[in-house]
Amino acid sequence: MDNQLHFCTVDEAVEEIRQGRMIIVTDDPGRENEADLIIAAEFATTEAINFMVTHARGLVCAPLSPERADALQLPLMTSVNRENMSTAFTVSVDAAHDITTGISAAERSLTIRTLADP
């Protein structure tokens, strides 16, 4: 297994995601100067989510198209967005079934996969 750090093209990154691999995406130092762990929802297993919360220690977010957010009736978190980068967060959600607190890696995984399931 190749554990060497390397940067790939966008097409290569998309293929990695398609194959079920988690990737690291970095942004411009002039923006937030951070990195995000990204995995396709269908591969967001308990183990993958546990890795994210253990090693990245940030928010676990699930990007949605405006159409999908509307279909799920998920409003924006705030009507006036004062966030520095104008990130369009919706209200926080958990899956409607088979969830207790929603905080465990297993329940977060279920919620992410549910959000992506049309």
Which residues does each PLM region occupy?
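Catalytic domains of riboflavin
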Residues: 1-118
